[in-house]
A protein has these predicted regions:
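Vicinal oxygen chelate
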Residues: 1-10, 31-32, 82-116
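N-terminal beta-strand motif that seeds the catalytic metal site of vicinal oxygen chelate
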Residues: 1-20, 24, 65-67
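Short alpha-helical
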Residues: 17, 75-76, 99
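Surface-exposed charge patches
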Residues: 20-21, 79, 106
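Residues at alpha-helix termini
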Residues: 24-25, 83
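Conserved short beta-strand elements that form part of the metal-binding/catalytic scaffold
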Residues: 28-64, 104-106, 110-116
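Mid-chain, well-packed structural core segment of small domains
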Residues: 63-82
Length: 116
């Protein structure tokens, strides 16, 4: 089995500069802001999935790069993370037309889970 990054989220107060740099470095075009994704601007990743760049959604949301790994069973993935000691910031949350995601903290790192 292999792991696949389905969604890589960059949260930064410098959205325009980050999008401009990534677009120029990789010759890609980012979308207009997508409301369902927190006004993230997205671009396709090689092999499937997307990268997104968005601003903080809360005053206390720190900049972060958070990969969301694809799973066939998000509830089983949540249970496995909990068994390893993870604390969840967001449990399985559907985004209509996009998929279902969860966010957890483990070892001082933010992790994401994604099910299509």
């Amino acid at each position: 089995a292999e792991m696949q990054v389905q969604y890589r989220e960059i949260v930064t107060p410098e959205v325009d500069a980050t999008v401009q740099a990534l677009a120029a470095q990789h010759s890609v075009t980012f979308s207009d802001p997508v409301a369902m994704l927190g006004n993230a601007r997205t671009a396709a990743l090689t092999g499937g999935g997307r990268i997104s760049v968005r601003g903080p959604m809360r005053e206390d949301e720190a900049p972060v790069v958070r990969p969301y790994l694809l799973t066939d069973d998000i509830e089983a993935a949540i249970a496995a993370a909990e068994a390893a000691g993870a604390e969840f910031a967001m449990r399985a949350t559907p985004i209509p037309g996009e998929g279902t995601f969860a966010i957890y903290f483990l070892g001082g790192i933010e992790h994401g889970i994604w099910q299509n």
